[in-house]
Design a protein with these regions (language model features):
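Hydrophobic alpha-helical connector segments
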Residues: 58, 72-98, 151-158
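Short hydrophobic/aromatic patch on the recognition helix
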Residues: 39-49
Length: 192
């Protein structure tokens, strides 16, 4: 890491952490193990991040910018509320399938013994996802799908479905793809 630029070093640390999170056994990751993976000292890690919590915050920032960036694209591209909700569901499940290590962050698995603010941040992430679903479902109501009175409950149901699929994926050691057999399930969830 000696010949890389500081911004690249931070990225290398986060990539190594994400890679370590992809291990199916889900063991606790220590800064010593992360430093060994990168062939640097723990002090070298702490030159870029004040704590392991800051490293996890870096991963959460990546998750937030990726997910909400795509949600914004979906709402701009799709005119139909049901289509928006369906696309968001598929994107959220696909994000986990493409980023198994990040799935452990999404479900809070690796945040259990870390700084409490990290779990609060993930809870806020879930709230924003639910808000995005509410927006899509409200649009769908104006287009003749469903009832306004059901929007909040349906949005909550969709978030619970997604987080359940993420949990199952992570707890299966990343063997049960979150996108597996979802077509019929999503049709049932989104039926008016």
């Amino acid at each position: 890491m000696a010949s890389t630029k500081p911004g690249q070093r931070k990225l290398q640390i986060l990539q190594a952490l994400a890679s370590m999170l992809e291990q199916p056994k889900g063991e606790k990751i220590t800064t010593a193990a992360l430093a060994a993976r990168l062939s640097v000292s723990e002090a070298a890690l702490y030159r870029h991040f004040a704590s392991k919590a800051q490293m996890y915050e870096g991963l959460i920032e990546f998750i937030e910018s990726s997910v909400f960036g795509v949600i914004n694209q979906i709402t701009e591209k799709e005119d139909g509320g049901m289509e928006q909700a369906y696309a968001m569901l598929n994107m959220l499940l696909g994000f986990a399938a493409n980023n198994p290590g990040m799935t452990r962050v999404l479900i809070g698995d690796v945040l259990v013994n870390e700084d409490e603010r990290l779990q609060h941040r993930m809870n806020a992430f879930y709230d924003k996802i639910e808000l995005a679903f509410k927006g899509a479902l409200r649009l769908a109501v104006t287009q003749g799908h469903g009832q306004e009175a059901d929007v909040a409950a349906r949005a909550s149901l969709l978030v619970n479905y997604v987080t359940g699929r993420w949990h199952r994926y992570a707890k299966s050691g990343f063997k049960i793809n979150p996108l597996e057999a979802t077509s019929l399930q999503l049709s049932l969830l989104l039926a008016a």
